[in-house]
Amino acid sequence: MLKPVRFAHTKPYWQVLILILLPLQMPERTLLQAGESSSSATSSSKHQSDTATPQIFSADFENASYGIYTKEQLSLDWNNPSWSDGIEEKRVSVVATNRGSRALAVTFPAHTYGPEKNGAVWRLKFDASYPAVEARFDVMFKQGFGFARGGKLPGLFGGKGNTGGDKPTGKDGFSARMMWREDGRAVQYLYYPDQPDRYGHQIPWIDPTTGKQIKFQPGQWHTVVHQLAINTPEKNNGTLRAFFDGKIVLDIDNLRFRDTDDFAIDGFLLSTFFGGGDASWQTTAEEILFFDNFRIRKIPN
């Protein structure tokens, strides 16, 4: 039995989404923290000098207007990213959910793949580097979601946040995203100097109770948590732990993310698209997934 991995139409589509997701009655709560203002402590990374408040970032979209998620709202919520995919293309919306809150909905058009045509990507750059960080968020794939060959999900990064076949050297950066694979199987997707191939290292998430690989269930909210601690330069003592709906599903304690102290954990990569870099990864129909309740905080190293 496998064990948890140890290395040791006629309406705008956002209106249709609201009708799909909510048995009506849109809430009017105003709990948004990410978009309060660019100088707000909770809008990005303004509390890192406050030892009593380890929070780096939070976003729950309760103050965001329903409809297309604009470039202006992205800038306000996510510490002014320098670039993005999917925002100007209107593939991201704020919608009402079936649990009485607001969430981001990301659309993947039919017969597309890659971030230029499909999904959304941007980077939240922290205002400081951190040695150990926890990132958590809620995610739901729409009912009947067609997983195809798989696609990307968010995660932490450092330095230039290597992706796209850019294997880290130890002196440039790393990334620690996720993927879904066929049938919704969950894997960690790591770019780090010791990865075995050019493209990211896929490490299965394993249910500690059943020994089976974790799967995302369409139509159900899941809570994902990543806990990453950077290594001492040139040493294999970095750690990565992952939790799925409260269960630990990944525990690695011998990772080398860097050979220099020029970077540590520097940001969070909101990355979701089908692919893969060729048409074998494309969607077979329009698909949608939802994100909510992002929380990123410092943790003990």
Model-inferred region functions:
Residues 15-25:
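Bacterial N-terminal signal peptides
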Residues 31, 35-301:
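Low-complexity, Ser/Thr/Pro/Gly-rich disordered linker/stalk regions
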Residues 1-10:
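N-terminal secretory signal peptides that target proteins for export/translocation
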Residues 27-29:
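Membrane-interface motif at the C-terminal end of an N-terminal transmembrane signal
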Residues 6, 17-19, 93:
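N-terminal non-cleavable signal-anchor helices
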